[in-house]
Structure formats: C-alpha cells, structure tokens
A protein has these predicted regions:
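Intrinsically disordered, low-complexity segments enriched in glycine/proline and serine/threonine
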Residues: 9, 49, 163-166
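Short, low-complexity cationic-aromatic patches
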Residues: 56-72, 109-126
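Extended intrinsically disordered, low-complexity coil regions enriched in Ser, Thr, Gly, Ala
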Residues: 70-103, 133-148
C-alpha cells in the first residue's frame, strides 16, 4: 500500500522532527553542555552514602575487602577532584591516608579482617566528607576525568600530581 501525503494534510502544530533526530554536531554540543552540570542529586547521594557506609564498615571491622577498596578509590577520586579545583587536599594528606589504607590492607590480608584504627578514622572521615561535597558540586566532566584517571592509576599508571588549580569556593 502506497500512501501519498500532501503537505496540506499534515497538521502544522505537530512537531516536524523528533527531539533525538538532530545532527551529530548538535548531539555533541548537548552532551558537551551536560558535562558542565553537576551529576543528579540522587546519584551523588547514592555514591556518597556508599562511601560513608564503607567508612563505617571499616570503623567496626569488615570481613570483606570491598569497603577498604571503596574508601581507597574515594580517597583518590577526592584528590583528583581537588587537583581539578574542587576542594583542598594536600599531597601530604594523600600520603598519610595512603599509608593508613596500606596498613588496613596489610592487616586485612594477614588476619582476614579489614578495620581502620581509631586514631586514623578522623583523617579518612574528613576525606570522605570532602568527596561527599565534591560529588554535589563538581561537574560531570570533572567527575568523568577523575574516574578515567583513577582507572588508569588502578591499571598501573604511576600517580603524578597535576598542577593544582585554584580551589573553587566550597
């Protein structure tokens, strides 16, 4: 069956194109603009809650390595975001936190329980709080760059501090 529509039979109030039928350039521009916005609040809340729960698990002791891995990842993401201008996180603080987490992993592998010594809790709690704040403020683009950097670091690329940008107001 061949249907031949004349221009006069189409309602002019109807949309001529569907919203997703755009040129590749327009799609890239729209995606580029999305990179400038923060992630949705619900996503930020979920990620922050997971970090806080992992910290609580380490505080009370965990039979699973996952909370220690999660806190270590959050620690590096917070550092990478701070280097991009989202908060303050000194290199010395990173070194101290890294030593703390190294001890958590060593002890956990030796005895099967991953726990955070009480003396080190406040240091990591401050980092998790910074990460929580960064998730609510940093753009999707900054979070994507930090995540890509974390994946390269986990794959074996050595950590190299970026020239820190001036911190955005918190």
């Amino acid at each position: 069956m061949n249907v031949n529509l004349k221009r006069s039979t189409i309602d002019p109030r109807m949309s001529r194109t569907l919203p997703f039928q755009r040129s590749p350039q327009a799609t890239r521009a729209r995606l580029g603009k999305a990179q400038l916005l923060p992630i949705p609040r619900a996503v930020a809340d979920e990620l922050a809650l997971a970090a806080h729960m992992s910290l609580a698990a380490l505080r009370s002791g965990s039979s699973d390595i996952a909370p220690a891995r999660h806190i270590t990842e959050a620690m590096y993401l917070a550092k990478f975001l701070a280097e991009a201008g989202h908060g303050d996180f000194s290199h010395d603080e990173l070194l101290q936190a890294d030593r703390t987490m190294g001890a958590v992993f060593d002890t956990g592998h030796a005895c099967g329980s991953w726990s955070l010594p009480a003396d080190d809790f406040d240091r990591l709690a401050a980092i998790v709080s910074l990460y929580d704040h960064q998730l609510r403020r940093a753009s999707l683009g900054a979070l994507s760059v930090a995540s890509e950097r974390l994946e390269r670091f986990k794959a074996g690329e050595p950590y190299q501090p970026m020239q820190a940008r001036k911190s955005a107001p918190l």
